């Protein structure tokens, strides 16, 4: 694919790296870290947040460490994937189960969070509550203590309302992926945009959003709270960048989406002169 030509530096806050196979995994094919790096370069992406894909049961410690190793000497920022014992559902039965939920050995503990936070290979956390469960209160307390950003899969299995109830009372930055509406749920995406009015530490990433009117509304109403996410490898970075480049928004707002807002969230993880 041809390289995109544009005048923006792009930071991508959403790319998946398969730890077990040594490559990035999408349905039916695997892409190596080198190929992911090339595709990011083609799209003008200068830094990419990467995290391991899901696994059935078990701890994410080895997968996180593998992603961190494969990020060395590449323009990747490793996020540690975390899990927990609590059911993210909004029904009364879920709340009842959570009263008796206890952390097991394979769940992320406060000690794990502390270790990740003070390992300079990791720059934040990835959480998919619908697949991996929610951390318990002690682990959330430690996430709040370390203060690193948490990228949260948002959608039909974990709605913006559920994210607000479970996470947004905390002080750490929350980046709600997919505008909180995966897969392509306009109503949930609209709820997530409205959520920004009430929660100063909440941000949205653009991965898999596709709806131009919702993207433009969020960028125009909340220009400091929208971050670019490619969703690679399921979406090619070129395609994801073009979706933002073609929005009818001011250039300064576009620059915030591509670069400046990520700097606010990632802080010292991004060098000032890259």
Question: Model-found features: residue ranges?
Answer:
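Generic structural signal for well-ordered alpha-helices
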Residues: 33-37, 64-68, 110-114, 140, ...
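Mid-to-C-terminal alpha-helical segments outside catalytic/metal-binding sites
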Residues: 1-17, 22, 29-47, 238-274
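Conserved, mostly hydrophobic/aromatic
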Residues: 14, 40, 67, 125, ...
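Active-site gating/metal-coordination segments in enzymes
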Residues: 61-151
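Catalytic pocket-lining loop regions of alpha/beta-barrel enzymes
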Residues: 132-228
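Divalent metal-dependent hydrolysis catalytic cores, especially in the metallo-beta-lactamase
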Residues: 15-16, 27, 34-58, 76-83, ...
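Acidic-and-aromatic substrate-binding clefts and catalytic sites of carbohydrate-active enzymes
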Residues: 22-31, 54-62, 85-89, 104-106, ...
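Hydrophobic faces of well-ordered beta-strands that scaffold small-molecule active sites
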Residues: 10-15, 48-50, 78-81, 123-127, ...
